[in-house]
Amino acid sequence: MEDENILRNAVNLQVLKFHYPEIESIIDIASHVAVYQFDVGSQKWLKTSIEGTFFLVKDQRARVGYVILNRNSPENLYLFINHPSNVHLVDRYLIHRTENQHVVGLWMFDPNDMSRIFNIVKESLLR
């Protein structure tokens, strides 16, 4: 089982590096995530067309970010998390305020993934 996980992580890292060569390592994975964007004008969450596997990653400059390999189209999502205060856990959503002040909501199918990923993000950014 452990050999299987090592192989799966190696294959996943190869796929991510194909799209984003600067990725150095995978920190954690969640199997299914849907992405929402907060619309300031209407004060509502809008579901985007991006959903798929979530990879918490570290790049060559030791920045923490995430990639969502989109199952619906070739448009993936790759964002960095610059500061622990930019990430919050609200209900079943991981809320991320991006560098350009957009607000992204990530809904994870498994609630255990949500809290685990949130804690790892906070811990990684505080190092």
From Swiss-Prot:
Checking PANTHER family in the record gives: DECAPPING PROTEIN 1, ISOFORM A (PTHR16290:SF0), TRANSCRIPTION FACTOR SMIF DECAPPING ENZYME DCP1 (PTHR16290)
Compartment(s) of residence: Cytoplasm; Nucleus
Q: Which residues form the signal peptide?
A: none
Gene Ontology MF annotations:
mRNA phosphatase activator activity; RNA binding
Q: Does the keyword Methyltransferase apply?
A: no
Q: Which family does it belong to?
A: Belongs to the DCP1 family.
The protein's superkingdom reads Eukaryota
Keyword Transferase appears in the UniProt entry: no
Briefly state the protein's biological role: Component of the decapping complex necessary for the degradation of mRNAs, both in normal mRNA turnover and in nonsense-mediated mRNA decay. Removes the 7-methyl guanine cap structure from mRNA molecules, yielding a 5'-phosphorylated mRNA fragment and 7m-GDP. Decapping is the major pathway of mRNA degradation in yeast. It occurs through deadenylation, decapping and subsequent 5' to 3' exonucleolytic decay of the transcript body.
Q: How does it assemble?
A: Component of the decapping complex composed of dcp1 and dcp2.
**What name is this protein filed under?**
mRNA-decapping enzyme subunit 1
